[in-house]
Regions:
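N-terminal charged segments
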Residues: 1-54
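A short helix-loop-beta-strand connector motif used in the catalytic cores of GNAT acetyltransferases and
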Residues: 2-8, 13, 55, 80-82, ...
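Acyl-donor-binding surface of acyltransferase catalytic domains
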Residues: 33-100, 253-255
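Conserved beta-strand-loop-alpha-helix junction that forms the acyl-donor binding cleft
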Residues: 60-69, 198-201, 227-237, 253-260
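Conserved active-site alpha-helix within GNAT-family acetyltransferase domains
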Residues: 65-81, 203, 207, 219, ...
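A short beta-loop-alpha structural element at the N-terminal edge
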Residues: 103-115
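A conserved beta-strand-loop-helix scaffold within acyl/acetyltransferase catalytic domains
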Residues: 130-145, 150-151, 172-195
Length: 260
């Protein structure tokens, strides 16, 4: 099965699922409801059976809250991973902090290779991004911000640009040690991804990237910022709490179903 054979959206009556390959594989996919929709169990079942008929062997869901999970569980999905969900109300912003070892700048498409190298060592295999995952994270919301922490000298990097400037720098940047993708939809912002190279953790890199995301969200008059993190990622959880996020009660879950 090739990429063109995999539908990006599966529609059944009035509900739809957004579908994408899992880490470049088309025999394993990620599916989730289109924002603002709530499919029934029958609609989920029909959509998944279409995927199985097309040659898909396994389906993972996007991270879902308890109400969103119900039709998938009723359609035969089981829990695979639990995520903690945290929220920042943007009322008391932390003071931006910039470690002397690097600077923050806008991320470019030319950074993707280095960014994905960082991602590969920051997360275990199940959670790692590939290029398509990164692009989808940037495009998941109407507006987004892509920032990188760069350890190269300032005079070796292109000048920063405004969020609306999509020009490509003449000189490709280097020295990426961390990155963040933040998106805004309606009045809520989402810290879609935060990754720091293990060799640069514990020196303020993650703090600087999160503070940047919060400042950006506040400047765009968002009501809050949401972020999720793996249940066992204590370092990230404590980082968010220390910067003013609060733990939400139920969290999120990734569900799974295979073709058996």
């Amino acid at each position: 099965m090739t990429h063109p054979d995999l539908p990006r959206t599966l529609r059944h009556r009035d509900a739809a699922l957004r579908v994408s390959p899992w880490r470049g594989r088309t025999d394993i996919v990620v599916a989730g409801p289109i924002p603002g929709t709530q499919p029934s169990a029958a609609q989920v079942h029909t959509a998944v059976e279409k995927l199985f008929a097309a040659g898909v062997s396994e389906v993972y869901t996007t991270a879902l809250g308890p109400p969103e999970q119900q039709p998938f569980i009723a359609a035969g999905f089981s829990h695979r991973e639990h995520l903690r969900l945290l929220r920042h109300d943007l009322r008391d912003l932390p003071t931006p902090r910039a470690p002397a070892s690097h600077h923050l700048r806008r991320g470019w498409r030319r950074d993707y290779a280095e960014v994905l190298d960082v991602d590969a060592v920051a997360f275990d295999g199940f959670w790692q991004f590939d290029r398509r995952s990164l692009v989808e994270a940037r495009n998941a919301t109407p507006t987004s911000r892509f920032r990188v922490a760069d350890a190269s000298p300032l005079d070796a990097s292109p000048l920063d640009a405004s969020p609306s400037d999509d020009r490509t720098p003449a000189t490709p940047p280097s020295g990426v040690v961390g990155y963040a993708v933040t998106g805004r939809a309606n009045r809520t912002c989402y810290l879609q991804r935060l990754a720091v190279h293990p060799r640069h953790q514990g020196v303020g890199t993650g703090t600087a990237l999160v503070c940047d995301a919060l400042q950006w969200a506040h400047a765009r008059r968002a009501d809050d910022v949401l972020v999720n993190t793996q249940e066992g990622n204590t370092a990230a959880f404590e980082l968010y709490l220390g910067l003013g996020f609060t733990d939400q009660t139920n969290g999120l879950d990734v569900l799974h179903r295979d073709n058996r």
